[in-house]
UniProtKB/Swiss-Prot annotation:
NDH-1 shuttles electrons from NADH, via FMN and iron-sulfur (Fe-S) centers, to quinones in the respiratory chain. The immediate electron acceptor for the enzyme in this species is believed to be a menaquinone. Couples the redox reaction to proton translocation (for every two electrons transferred, four hydrogen ions are translocated across the cytoplasmic membrane), and thus conserves the redox energy in a proton gradient. The keyword NAD applies. PANTHER family: NADH DEHYDROGENASE [UBIQUINONE] IRON-SULFUR PROTEIN 2, MITOCHONDRIAL, NADH-UBIQUINONE OXIDOREDUCTASE 49 KDA SUBUNIT. Belongs to the complex I 49 kDa subunit family. This is NADH-quinone oxidoreductase subunit D. GO terms for molecular function: NAD binding; NADH:ubiquinone reductase (non-electrogenic) activity; quinone binding. It catalyses: a quinone + NADH + 5 H(+)(in) = a quinol + NAD(+) + 4 H(+)(out). Keywords: Cell inner membrane, Cell membrane, Membrane, NAD, Quinone, Translocase, Transport. It is a peripheral membrane protein. One of its GO terms (cellular component) is plasma membrane.
Length: 400
């Protein structure tokens, strides 16, 4: 019997029989280590820093540090006119600028008690759903890269390019649109826009199914996401989760259905939630599946809007746009279903100024990120990357 001393780690006693070494006893101890991920790190989406307390490869706690993209959005809003705030909202969730514009305008129009022309409402929904699909394609493509798959990223951005080209044709911009105005739109859609959108829908529907199968039928992708980062429905509700994050936990909640705005009450679409067959309800794979299934529902909504949209003769997209926005004294909370969840605006008016007394943004990304401690506890460090990617956060909206 031979005993070897190992500094700080007890002893390792070895027994030699012929040429074979057999380990009889091993006393090893571990100690916790602080691991900093970010703010510039391949695993983080945007400028986010995670301070992780680890025991070996196991994460015992992950604390997010925010504020690297803080731009004083809410304070700026108190010093500009109501319509001038719209371009600021584009720069919050810059991957879904039109959806952010929609949420803000819904709130201001509610405060003003404005009636919006029907054609404007249909156009708003069409461009919002196109923007939703483009945003989900970024989420799915970058998530695949996070987990080591490069090909799906190329497919996603190939098809996203078609959407950005259509939005550029309609709005004049690819990302920061300033298209939805308080009371109307900057422009009507160009002639032939509806036909081009329908052509894209017919082209993209089989591509979306192919993309879904490419990942959900990939054994490596499933093993990296199934059963990882599980969030029970009751805990998700207590955190205030919304959007695909909440639906991924099995809660069928969608503001377009549960608290409808615009012309969504007239449209027929499903609110997908995981059934537990492919994934564990509430895990990373469930959240991915919800985003993939929502793409098909957005295509259905677009088709219905084009079919029901009123004609263009004599249409002025700015007919209901007020020349000067000075709401009566009061307060309002308006919200919309963004690709990442509920984006809401609490606006307070003093009845005198053309600027809001207070404009508070309720960010879905900030709320979703707040659950990082619970999601990461007990997970392995490589799984932490899968969890962060499943949140689909945009730090421009988190920090504002």
């Amino acid at each position: 019997m031979q005993e070897l001393e190992m500094a700080g780690q007890g002893s390792l006693r070895l027994s030699r029989k012929s040429d074979t070494i057999v380990v009889l006893e091993k006393d090893l101890s571990t100690e916790q280590m602080v691991l900093s991920m970010g703010p510039q790190h391949p695993s983080t989406h945007g400028v986010l820093r995670l301070e992780c307390l680890t025991d070996g490869e196991v994460v015992t706690e992950a604390e997010p540090y925010l504020g690297y993209l803080h731009r004083c959005f809410e304070k700026h809003c108190e010093h500009v006119d109501y319509p001038a705030i719209v371009p600021y909202t584009d720069r919050m969730d810059y991957l879904a600028g039109i959806n952010s514009e929609m949420a803000y305008c819904v709130a201001v129009e509610k405060l003003l008690d404005l009636e919006i022309p029907r054609r404007v409402e249909f156009i708003r929904v069409i461009v919002s759903e196109l923007n939703r699909i483009a945003s989900h394609l970024v989420a799915i493509g970058t998530y695949a890269i996070d987990l080591g798959a490069f090909t799906p990223f190329l497919f996603c951005f190939r098809d996203r390019e078609h959407i950005l080209n259509m939005l550029e044709w309609a709005t004049g911009a690819r990302m920061l649109y300033n298209y939805i105005w308080v009371g109307g739109l900057a422009y009507d859609v160009p002639a032939g826009f509806n036909e081009r959108v329908l052509e894209f829908v017919n082209y993209f529907r089989p591509k979306a199914l192919e993309l879904q199968q490419l990942l959900t039928e990939n054994e490596i992708f499933v093993k990296r996401t199934k059963g990882i980062g599980i969030m029970p429905a009751d805990v998700a509700i207590n955190y205030g989760w919304s959007g695909p994050m909440l639906r991924g936990s099995g809660v069928q909640w969608d503001i377009r259905r549960n608290d409808p705005y615009s012309i969504y009450p007239e449209l027929d679409f499903a609110v997908p939630v995981p059934d537990g067959k492919l994934s564990v309800v509430g895990d990373c794979l469930s959240r991915h599946l919800v985003r993939a299934l929502e793409i098909e529902e957005s295509l259905k909504i677009i088709e219905q809007c084009i079919d029901k949209m009123p004609g263009t003769q004599g249409f002025d997209p700015r007919s209901a746009v007020p020349k000067r926005v000075r709401p009566k004294a009061g307060e309002v909370y308006g919200r919309a279903e963004n690709p990442r969840g509920e984006l809401g605006f609490y606006i307070q008016s003093d009845g005198k100024s053309t600027s809001p007394l207070r404009c508070k943004a309720r960010s879905s990304c900030f709320v979703n990120l707040s659950a990082m401690k619970d999601l990461s506890r007990g997970q392995l460090i490589p799984d932490l990357v899968a969890i962060i990617g499943s949140l689909d956060i945009v730090l421009g909206e988190v920090d504002r």
